[in-house]
């Protein structure tokens, strides 16, 4: 007998999430994971490493609450926003009974976390204008416990319409929790829906330090919600989820100086993004450039496979989304520093016209 037969059926059937790092391949220009292009120095004090860390480090909780404009009892720190997604499913969904709703094409971990927990998935694709289908979602509220929305959406870069979200939250009162993933919100902070937490106890917002804060390597995320939701999640989270060095780095990132550096990075990356989009508009191989509210641009090419192969041959690693619904020939490009973006454009300019 194979030892695999002892695993849960759902795990045996599970296809693991194909993270950018897992499927990236080999290259010297990495623009496939929406990471920041450069790392920044932090200091770590080792005098407390012999002790278990705080479950919820106060300096991090208070720092993020002040940054996000909420109360500390509305914040839960986790091992990345991915753990926040899983905690929400484990807390509010009964395995084998309940379902979540997602709007593909969108971030893959919502579905993976649900599958791992034995929770069903209802798919309600985005509309042709790449917005959630609000009436269709409202019709399914009796069937689901959690609705996951990503704003800006990964991979399309679109923002969730605020009016549609408010109407959905009204209809979902006492019926379902609506989760808005704001992993990329620092690149368009004016579009945050955190202010709606005061009106809707069934709204949850997830955040991360991985993108604009340039800290993907430390895996630190946040859940912003009503104190009641946070208290429920705190029952389920591991006893010591945030290692002491991670808490120290996160606290430094959330200090006034850390926030100022983050905002400077955002300004620079948004400039790079605008210049990159302007250059794309001049190229014969580009068919469509999607919305650009994150630190990435999704591009539909005339021949996406040829572009992806040419980039790979040049050692440039991008993320292919051509198999996702409505995204044929589409490739996502993370915004890096200028030299990296110039390298991408050089490959695109060298593509022979007859190929398209």
UniProtKB/Swiss-Prot annotation:
Annotated InterPro entries: Aminotrans_II_pyridoxalP_BS, Aminotransferase_I/II_large, HisP_aminotrans, PyrdxlP-dep_Trfase, PyrdxlP-dep_Trfase_major, PyrdxlP-dep_Trfase_small
CDD domains (alphabetical): AAT_like
Catalytic activity: L-histidinol phosphate + 2-oxoglutarate = 3-(imidazol-4-yl)-2-oxopropyl phosphate + L-glutamate
Known EC number: 2.6.1.9
Residues with N6-(pyridoxal phosphate)lysine modification: 211
Cofactor(s) the record lists: pyridoxal 5'-phosphate
PROSITE patterns the UniProt entry points to: AA_TRANSFER_CLASS_2
GO terms, biological process: L-histidine biosynthetic process
Pfam families: Aminotran_1_2
Pathway: Amino-acid biosynthesis; L-histidine biosynthesis; L-histidine from 5-phospho-alpha-D-ribose 1-diphosphate: step 7/9
Keywords (A to Z) from UniProt: Amino-acid biosynthesis, Aminotransferase, Histidine biosynthesis, Pyridoxal phosphate, Transferase
Example of a GO MF term: pyridoxal phosphate binding
HAMAP family the record matches: HisC_aminotrans_2
Family of this protein: Belongs to the class-II pyridoxal-phosphate-dependent aminotransferase family. Histidinol-phosphate aminotransferase subfamily.
Alphabetical list of NCBIfam families matching this protein: hisC
Quaternary structure and interacting proteins, as annotated: Homodimer.
Protein name from the UniProt record: Histidinol-phosphate aminotransferase
Organism, as annotated: Aeromonas hydrophila subsp. hydrophila (strain ATCC 7966 / DSM 30187 / BCRC 13018 / CCUG 14551 / JCM 1027 / KCTC 2358 / NCIMB 9240 / NCTC 8049)
């Amino acid at each position: 007998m194979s030892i695999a037969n002892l695993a849960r059926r759902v795990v045996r059937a599970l296809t693991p999430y194909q993270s950018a790092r897992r499927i990236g391949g080999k290259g010297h220009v990495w623009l496939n994971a929406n990471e920041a292009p450069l790392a920044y120095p932090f200091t770590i004090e080792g005098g407390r490493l012999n002790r278990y860390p705080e479950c919820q480090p106060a300096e991090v909780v208070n720092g993020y609450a002040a940054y996000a404009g909420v109360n500390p009892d509305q914040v839960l720190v986790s091992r990345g926003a991915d753990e926040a997604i899983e905690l929400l499913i484990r807390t509010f969904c009964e395995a084998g009974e309940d379902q979540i709703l997602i709007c593909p094409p969108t971030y893959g971990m919502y579905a993976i976390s649900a599958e791992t927990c034995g929770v069903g998935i209802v798919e309600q694709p985005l509309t042709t204008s790449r917005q959630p289908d609000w009436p269709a979602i409202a019709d399914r509220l009796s069937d689901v416990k959690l609705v996951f929305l990503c704003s800006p959406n990964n991979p399309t870069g679109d923002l969730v319409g605020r009016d549609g979200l408010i109407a959905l939250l009204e209809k979902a009162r006492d019926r379902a929790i609506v989760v808005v993933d704001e992993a990329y919100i620092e690149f368009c902070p004016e579009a945050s829906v955190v202010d709606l937490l005061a009106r809707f106890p069934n709204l949850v917002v997830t955040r991360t330090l991985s993108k604009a804060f340039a800290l993907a390597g430390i895996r630190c995320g946040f859940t912003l919600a009503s104190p009641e939701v946070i208290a429920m999640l705190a029952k389920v989270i591991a006893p010591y989820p945030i290692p002491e060095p991670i808490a120290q780095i996160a606290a430094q990132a959330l200090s006034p100086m850390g926030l100022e550096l983050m905002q400077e990075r955002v300004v620079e990356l948004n400039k790079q993004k605008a210049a990159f989009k302007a250059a794309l508009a001049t190229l014969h191989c580009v068919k469509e450039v999607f919305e650009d509210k994150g630190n990435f641009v999704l591009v539909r090419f005339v021949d996406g496979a040829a572009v992806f192969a040419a980039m790979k041959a040049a050692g440039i690693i991008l993320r292919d989304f051509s198999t996702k619904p409505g995204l044929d020939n589409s490739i996502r490009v993370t915004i890096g520093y200028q030299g990296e973006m110039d390298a991408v454009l050089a490959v695109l300019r060298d593509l022979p016209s007859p190929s398209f």
